[in-house]
Amino acid sequence: MKIITLLIIVVVVFSALGLWLVAYGNATSEERNMNYGISMSTDKMNYSVGEPIIMTLKILNYTKEDIVFHFNTAQRYDFIIEDEEGNEVWRWSQDMMFAMVLGEVTLGSNSPEVTYTAEYKDKFSPGYYKITGILVAKDRPMSGNVIIILK
């Protein structure tokens, strides 16, 4: 009985969230502190099964000062897609190898943002999915997520 009640609550929450997101053209999430932030979005919120999903992760500098992000490898970002139960169904970096070199990205007044994109083309079953975009900086890791609907 508890499992059924919990399942009903999850469905209601995801349905309400989906209805709220439908009012907006695409799915967007933004997280920030006083100096910098992250914006995660998709090209739209509702997809047909098999339709490509375009994901965009933006890192923004809200100041006129340089902000430096340091990395342990050549990887700068990642995208993860999870189903309604929280199971990871896709990770952008899954089958990739990154050079083991230290690196940095500097956001300043001349270049206050950097954008990373990825496209997912395989098929999922219809339902709600959470997409998380991650900046993998060792000193300032950040993430943002959005919910999409596959019909």
PLM segments and residue spans:
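Secretory targeting signatures
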Residues: 1-28
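Generic detector of bulky aromatic hydrophobic side chains
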Residues: 9-11, 56, 120, 134, ...
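Terminal connector regions
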Residues: 122-151
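Contiguous segments within soluble domain cores/interaction surfaces
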Residues: 25-40, 45-118, 128, 132-137
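Intrinsic-disorder/low-complexity peptide segments enriched for small residues
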Residues: 4-5, 17-19, 38, 133, ...
